[in-house]
Structure formats: C-alpha cells, structure tokens
Amino acid sequence: MWLLLPLSFLLTSTAQDGGKLLEGEECAPHSQPWQVALYERGRFNCGASLISPHWVLSAAHCQSRFMRVRLGEHNLRKRDGPEQLRTASRVIPHPRYEARSHRHDIMLLRLVQPARLTPQVRPVVLPTRCPHPGEACVVSGWGLVSHNEPGTTGRPQSQVSLPDTLHCANISIISDASCDKNYPGRLTNTMVCAGAEGRGAESCEGDSGGPLVCGGILQGIVSWGDVPCDNTTKPGVYTKVCRYVKWIRETMKRN
C-alpha cells in the first residue's frame, strides 16, 4: 500500500517513477474551476478544491508549514489572466487523522483573502448523499504523467514528467465489496474507491489532495492506493467527503 505523497516529497526523493494521473488527458482549460494548486516554498505540492470563497479542502497528508494557494490555474508555467494567489491563515487537518492507516485524510484551509469568484474560479458543491457504485466521476491533478520515449535499445521506454497543464481522467465509483477484495482489512466507511475498468487507479503521487467530482459534486479527495500505481489494476482510494460534511461545516463556522 502507499500514500499518495505530496509532490514536494517526490521531488526530493529517489527512484519515484510511479507518480502520474494514469491514462488521463489534458483537461479543457478551466473546465474544473474549483481545482486548486497548493504550493510549498515555491514548489507545487498538492491539489485541492475550492469549497467557498474563504475555504479550500485537501488531504491531511498534504499539510506543510509554508502553504500558498493558487486558484484559476491551468498551465502552471503560464499566466493567462484568471489566476489568483492566496495565503492560508489557518490549516486545519482532521483531529483524528492517522497517517499510518490513512484514516480521516482530510484538511481545511482558510484563506486570508477570499477568492474572487469568476467563471474560472468557483466553488465545487459539497455532497448531500454518498456516491453510488458505477457513478461516473472525473479526477484531476498536476501529478506526474507518463509518455513513451525511444530507449537505448530502440524500444519505447516509459518516462515520467511533471505536466504544465491540468490533467483529467474519467473513472467510476467501485463498490465497497469489490474494493475490499483489493485492500482486505484496510478500508473504512470514510473511504471510497474509484477507478477505470481494467486500468486501475488513474490517480497517483502528485495528484494528492485533488478532487474526485461526480456529476458536479465533490465526492472524494485523492488519498492512497496500490504501488506501483502505474502497474496496477487496483482502484485508487479516496477520502469519502459525504462522511465529513458535518465536520466541514462546523469547522468553517467556528473559524
């Protein structure tokens, strides 16, 4: 098993070749207007979701001391107008978060200055129900992507690189019973599995904290899965947002 590590960790580690949004393609620019990029000391670290003008939701394992929030992004290396830079005044991981078991892998960030809502920057809707097996969803992120390059023998070899642009993958919700067969004894009722038939997780390291959106509703946060994620048919595991709506709303109200 593995945790979907923040990209800042991967960039300072060795031999981390698995991190990518598998089989994903570049998203239509600003088609995911709730998508957030979290930065640490000037480096892209994790994904996140805008849920209100003042609040961003991500994974607790993305927590760091120096977090900057970038909204309205598509190409991280170019500015085309709608981008907004914000600072987090409060970083609030779930009080029961457990790094070892991945339980309660959810975190709220309060922005010092609220987001200015535009067609390219707007909140995603929180769920009023939990997702159903087979429900169609989209996972998005700037995690590492793979591509084939000619190798020294002339045969194509898989290479990985950090994409400039936001990538999306179409996946669907996997039933708890089916997912439990892949991760026996590891799942809780605060986790949900999603993947693509015969292709596995789709999300991988670097996509951490990003949104799993089903029918315009935020149903999951990229959390953990199998390793190596570019060579598995097991689904990815996401924090099940519907189980945390009460905590989210109460925390926002108190802060």
From Swiss-Prot:
Enzyme category, top tier: hydrolase
UniProtKB keywords: Disulfide bond, Glycoprotein, Hydrolase, Protease, Secreted, Serine protease, Signal, Zymogen
Residue numbers spanned by region Serine protease: 21-253
EC number: 3.4.21.-
Propeptide: 16-20
Covalent S-S links between cysteines: 46-62, 137-214, 179-193, 204-229
Single GO cellular component term: secretory granule
Active site: 61 (charge relay system), 105 (charge relay system), 208 (charge relay system)
Function: Protease whose physiological substrate is not yet known.
Name by which UniProt lists this protein: Kallikrein-15
Origin species: Saguinus oedipus
Gene: KLK15
